[in-house]
Amino acid sequence: MPKRVLQGVVISSKADKTVTVKVERKFKHPIYKKFVKVSKKYAAHDSENRYQEGDKVSIIESRPISKTKTWIVVNGK
């Protein structure tokens, strides 16, 4: 099974080797037919402390790195 890849924005980079990435998705509500925007935060591993707040990044699913980190930052702008 392929690993999931998500795109989001770094909202926190205060922790060492960890960034918090906010991922937004849009879907159409099944009853009201309105597009709803939902966001979720993921803790991702950034081994070189390269990314700062506001950077757009891609994260990929991986094995558990810690209690909350199961994603790795693969590239960004």
From Swiss-Prot:
GO terms for biological process: translation. It comes from Rickettsia canadensis (strain McKiel). It comes from the Bacteria. One of the primary rRNA binding proteins, it binds specifically to the 5'-end of 16S ribosomal RNA. Belongs to the universal ribosomal protein uS17 family. Part of the 30S ribosomal subunit. NCBIfam families: PRK05610.1 (NF004123), uS17_bact (TIGR03635). This is Small ribosomal subunit protein uS17. One of its GO terms (cellular component) is cytosolic small ribosomal subunit. Signal peptide: none annotated. InterPro entries: NA-bd_OB-fold (IPR012340), Ribosomal_uS17 (IPR000266), Ribosomal_uS17_bact/chlr (IPR019984), Ribosomal_uS17_CS (IPR019979). Keywords: Ribonucleoprotein, Ribosomal protein, RNA-binding, rRNA-binding. GO terms for molecular function: rRNA binding; structural constituent of ribosome.
